């Protein structure tokens, strides 16, 4: 995977590596053009950044999570970053959660912006169960994956049964996003403090707003190690 690096925060390696995963049909350079890197730097946050070209080709050939591990996360750990956060937009949010699901203990936290949450029939199945008064746990008990490699179903199982010692998971989305119904279901698996919304749809204006709000929560260090 191609990776754009931004290591301007500290004289030496920062304590935290923030890995940004773009959405489908989106290049890492777009995250730069839309001000995501600049927003981090304006706040003086002491993090190194890696913008990953996790494009759809890796999804189509089934190598997305393995390539993230071999090309990005495992080398980052080997180079000394022990605190790693993933931040993903749309398909990038799906990739971030799917990676954490498959690699326990590798990341400290995940920030998902308008994440893709799997095929629509599955999301509709979950929504129907909730509308009938069944809990997410009850839905899960009666639901079966399509096959042994049904990542969409596995992701929802992970969301519903996420371990207490797993990575901190945050969700943000526009209230008019075309996937907002799925986001509202995902929000039911999270503490309210880890869910934020903004006016707008599946587009950059709400994403920029939500990114800024998340950066201002104080989750990332503001001082470099001495």
Regions found by a protein language model. Give the residues of each.
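Non-catalytic cap/lid and distal C-terminal segments of serine-dependent acyl enzymes
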Residues: 1-226
């Amino acid at each position: 995977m191609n990776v754009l690096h931004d290591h301007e925060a500290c004289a030496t390696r920062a304590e935290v590596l923030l890995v940004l995963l773009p959405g489908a049909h989106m290049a890492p350079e777009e995250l730069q053009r839309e001000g995501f890197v600049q927003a981090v730097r304006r706040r003086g946050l002491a993090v190194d950044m890696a913008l990953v070209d996790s494009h759809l080709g890796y999804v189509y050939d089934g190598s997305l999570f393995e390539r993230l591990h071999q090309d990005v996360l495992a080398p980052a750990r080997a180079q000394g970053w022990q605190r790693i956060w993933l931040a993903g937009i749309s398909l990038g949010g799906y990739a971030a959660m799917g990676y954490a699901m498959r690699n326990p203990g590798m990341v400290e936290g995940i920030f998902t912006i308008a994440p893709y949450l799997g095929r629509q029939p599955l999301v509709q199945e979950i929504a129907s169960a909730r509308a009938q008064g069944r809990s997410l746990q009850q839905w899960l008990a009666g639901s079966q994956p399509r096959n042994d490699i049904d990542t969409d179903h596995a992701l929802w199982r992970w969301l519903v049964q996420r371990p207490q010692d797993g990575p901190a998971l945050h969700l943000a989305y526009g209230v008019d996003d075309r996937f907002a119904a799925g986001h509202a279901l995902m929000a039911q698996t999270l503490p309210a403090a880890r869910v934020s919304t903004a006016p707008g749809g599946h587009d950059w204006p709400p994403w920029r707003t939500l990114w800024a709000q998340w950066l201002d929560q104080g989750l990332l260090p503001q001082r470099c190690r001495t």
